[in-house]
Amino acid sequence: MFDIGVNLTSTQFAKDRDKVVKRAREAGISGMLITGTNALESQQALSLARQHANYCWSTAGVHPHHASEWSAETAATLRRLAESPLVVAIGECGLDFNRNFSQPEQQVYAFNAQLALAAELSLPVFLHCREAHERFITILKPWLPSLKAAVLHCFTGARAELESCLAEGLSIGITGWICDERRGQELRELVPLIPADRLLLETDAPWLLPRDMRPRPPSRRNEPCFLPHIVQQVALLRGDDVDELAAQTALNARALFGL
């Protein structure tokens, strides 16, 4: 099992990060990708990856919520971070028109800039899209021939959106959203449509604690050690063997990020 989406820089992990990693190892997680969401957190993510070398890797990027912070200095910082072999993707980048913490045009500018950087550095992209699919694909598509690989993290969209992403060759990240019988019902029906070699799994910890976990942790905080629960649910929905799915998705992650 490999967790492709861990927000280990979150203050929710401030008091016990090492224990979180230890619990992940004990749960059978073979590695994890620490997400960078702005310049500072991308630096912190790389620092954490260095502390857990050969087990953790990181991304360097600016989440659409932080797109208004984009500057020439930001680009220079990401470029410098990406010199480390532990930085294996540019992102989390993309569009989020759900709440528009940054204006749409700021998001578009930062997204294009990061796609250009990923193409230049021959790195995969770790993508985010929420309520912006048409614009997202329109921007992304011309870059795809120049990109090493692309994964749309935490996919929660509709069938047409999944089919569109698959048609463009994207890999798909699935989280504990699949474990929510209310919000995740459509996703539960779609997950069998994802080709086995393009499926990746993630917790998005500390967010998205699987709703059907029993017992629930008192903190209600998600952790990478809960990834086996997501693997079990995805395997059940796809009719896959749990161990085979765990191995296949870990292989997919290592192949996509060049580990």
UniProtKB/Swiss-Prot annotation:
It is found in: Cytoplasm. The keyword Nuclease applies. Monomer. Its cofactor is Mg(2+). Keywords: Cytoplasm, Exonuclease, Hydrolase, Magnesium, Metal-binding, Nuclease. GO terms for cellular component: cytoplasm. It comes from the Bacteria. A divalent metal cation binds at E92, H128, H153. 3'-5' exonuclease that prefers single-stranded DNA and RNA. May play a role in the H(2)O(2)-induced DNA damage repair. PANTHER family: DEOXYRIBONUCLEASE TATDN1, TATD FAMILY DEOXYRIBONUCLEASE. The keyword Magnesium applies. Its EC number is 3.1.11.-, 3.1.13.-. Belongs to the metallo-dependent hydrolases superfamily. TatD-type hydrolase family. TatD subfamily. Pfam families: TatD_DNase. This is 3'-5' ssDNA/RNA exonuclease TatD. Its main location: cytoplasm. GO terms for molecular function: 3'-5'-RNA exonuclease activity; magnesium ion binding; single-stranded DNA 3'-5' DNA exonuclease activity.
